[in-house]
A protein has these predicted regions:
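N-terminal signal peptide c-region/cleavage motif recognized by signal peptidases
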Residues: 2-4
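Glycine- and aromatic-enriched low-complexity segments, predominantly in secreted/extracellular proteins
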Residues: 7-148
Length: 148
């Protein structure tokens, strides 16, 4: 009368807090892309690439082109986008986030006092994170061998 049923639960947790740029917004454990409405540019977080239109083609580059030399990436608003190839729907993002142009009230990782961001090697508190990693062993297997 009784049937045995087995359930399998798969939990996929993605984290990339330590690899997000320090100019990115706080509050996200994982980010695929940022969209920057001020300059209509995407940034691929895992690949560390800017994606922008040039002569009708999407360009993937490690830095912004010279036409954005006056853009302050620390102050510009960034929209977190976690979907594949959002630049293929750029018109949707332009329209949806046009109201965020010139919005400079977003807290960025570099200015955060949240210790989860200290893992980022470019964060001002990174050395505190490194020190905490070195002292987490509490004398058990932390590489400090003992001679008898």
């Amino acid at each position: 009368m009784f049937q045995n049923a087995q359930a399998q639960v798969h939990v996929n947790v993605r984290l990339n807090v330590g690899t997000q740029p320090v100019w990115g917004p706080v509050g996200y454990d994982y980010v695929d892309y940022y969209y920057m409405p001020d300059i209509d540019v995407f940034y691929n977080v895992p690949r560390h690439q800017y994606i922008y239109l040039q002569s009708g083609h999407w360009i993937f580059a490690s830095s912004l082109p010279s036409r954005y030399h006056s853009y302050d990436i620390n102050r510009g608003y960034k929209v977190v986008v976690n979907e594949p190839t959002p630049y293929h729907n750029a018109a949707v993002y332009r329209t949806k986030y046009a109201g965020y142009k010139n919005n400079h009230g977003q807290e960025i990782i570099r200015n955060s006092h949240d210790s989860r961001y200290w893992e980022n090697k470019n964060h001002p508190e990174h050395n505190k994170w490194k020190a905490s990693q070195n002292s987490n062993g509490n004398g058990h297997g932390n590489g400090n061998g003992h001679k008898n």
